[in-house]
């Protein structure tokens, strides 16, 4: 268990379980430490980091307004959520901030604010935010289709470490329908090269917070060629354990640090602009949605699409299928 997790999860277990003599026997001490370790694993590391960041933001917001963050009054929490909505934060982000506040209260032995809110000010505020955001038009990032991505890959010219890496990132991002968080979390050990292409182990994802892990197949490919492009990157990267994709410095040289999810988004937008696409309407998620759109157009079955995308809700995949078939056998096709 790392130091951050120990601090976040280190409740006064000894004080609660100490015998009358206030001396913890060695066996009980070991069992207490085991319980702490299991609690530390109850949340994915990325979730704990996000909760810690959200909690620090809430603390700062409270201090500026001379409010007490712990234990927080329900009215203070509701007002904080409203301030996030006013700042343009997404409903999912606001919900995560609330979960972070509740989690930190529980770790400190306090009752979460929403569980001592007889007037339901938190629940009602959150419901109002969600109702307003549903009514507000949202513009999703456009899918990048295979033909456009092939042009983007071609625009990553040269044999510099950055160019070779960028080609591999783009090809693999679409071929494996990866979220940007999954792309940057990949380790070299998660990759297995096989005759047909490669097997990729996704250890944690948005829909796999317990870290059960999922293995997906990525064919070598004939258009985007994710297999050969990844092999080219590996010949530059080397076989040292660590992140699959390293960050490059200002001179384009390779470091040993992992890429950030934001750098992946910027990479996609940079090459999109190079081939004439609007960078404002594309992002890292455009690769994932591009795979699903292309798979739907090609007539792939929902189970096969789900194998790669790992989405639990079939309704999301059905949306891609409907979008891909909008103009097929159109009712007005023979007379318009």
Give the label of every model feature segment:
Residues 1-336:
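Extended, non-catalytic subsegments within catalytic or DNA/protein-binding/adaptor domains
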